[in-house]
Amino acid sequence: MLSKQIPLGIYEKALPAGECWLKRLTLAKELGFDFVEMSVDETDERLSRLDWSREQRLALVSAVAETGVRVPSMCLSAHRRFPLGSEDDAVRTQGLEIMRKAIQFAQDVGIRVIQLAGYDVYYQQANDETRCRFRDGLKESVDMASRAQVTLAMEIMDYPLMNSISKALGYAHYLNNPWFQLYPDIGNLSAWDNDVQMELQAGIGHIVAVHVKDTKPGVFKNVPFGEGVVDFERCFETLKQSGYCGPYLIEMWSETAENPAAEVAKARDWVKARMASAGLVEAA
């Protein structure tokens, strides 16, 4: 795997739903992916993973060892429901406890990167106080992550607070900690009024992984590849020329589709063709 040009992964929510990780990783391997990104979202079902027993955690580690397909990253979107910027102390405390559990979980199962959602609050009105609480919550979270040697990486969002790499870099400079980095989503980055290529270049040295999806202005999910505004080839070329050698993750939500594997295979082929045009992978 280390000799490949780039590692290519698939988001858990692109694959059939269920809690059997051996099946999920086996399917990902059959589809030609190097890794799967786990989702811990705001649903009780996925949040409960943070309370897995020792045996359940070992089953995930065993599935990785058996298949050779890694689970190196977690998309932690549970903070929509329990935001670090909440003015409700009980909600904010729960958000910090979720962060602590996620970092401990990552340490236990070998996850290296936790992607954070850049919302001070999501279902409430933001203000100066929510942003201040969010910054303080990030500082506390990064302190915990440092002790565990787990990287927290901020996603570029569908939300004005964190809708550019430049804004996320402001937090990186504020925190000034090697365990806080950036995890841009080229779809989200392209849906706003950003100079996308300049933004990607600005993030080099801090980008630990890249989400790959298509978007339209105001539409951040479920846009079929090729039907949105993202200039994939230019993004891939910019990242390559800037020296980025890390993983790319195809982000999809096809777990409830009639045939998720077919949807994923179609998207994989489309993305890899653009990667080949940019010189990231060999043409099929």
Curated annotation (Swiss-Prot):
Protein's GO biological process: L-ascorbic acid catabolic process
Top-level taxon in the UniProt lineage: Bacteria
Keyword hit for Ubl conjugation: no
Pathway: Cofactor degradation; L-ascorbate degradation; D-xylulose 5-phosphate from L-ascorbate: step 3/4
Swiss-Prot/TrEMBL induction comment: Induced by L-ascorbate. Repressed by UlaR.
A GO term, aspect molecular function: intramolecular oxidoreductase activity, interconverting aldoses and ketoses
Keyword Hydrolase: no
Keyword tags: Isomerase
Enzyme class: isomerase
Reaction(s) catalysed by this chain's protein: L-ribulose 5-phosphate = L-xylulose 5-phosphate
Cross-referenced InterPro entries: L-Ru-5P_3-Epase (IPR004560), L-Ru-5P_3-Epase_Enterobacteria (IPR023492), Sugar_Epim/Isomerase (IPR050417), Xyl_isomerase-like_sf (IPR036237), Xyl_isomerase-like_TIM-brl (IPR013022)
EC number: 5.1.3.22
Family: Belongs to the L-ribulose-5-phosphate 3-epimerase family.
Role according to the record: Catalyzes the isomerization of L-xylulose-5-phosphate to L-ribulose-5-phosphate. Is involved in the anaerobic L-ascorbate utilization.
UniProt name for this protein: L-ribulose-5-phosphate 3-epimerase UlaE
Species whose genome carries this gene: Salmonella heidelberg (strain SL476)
Designated gene of the protein: ulaE
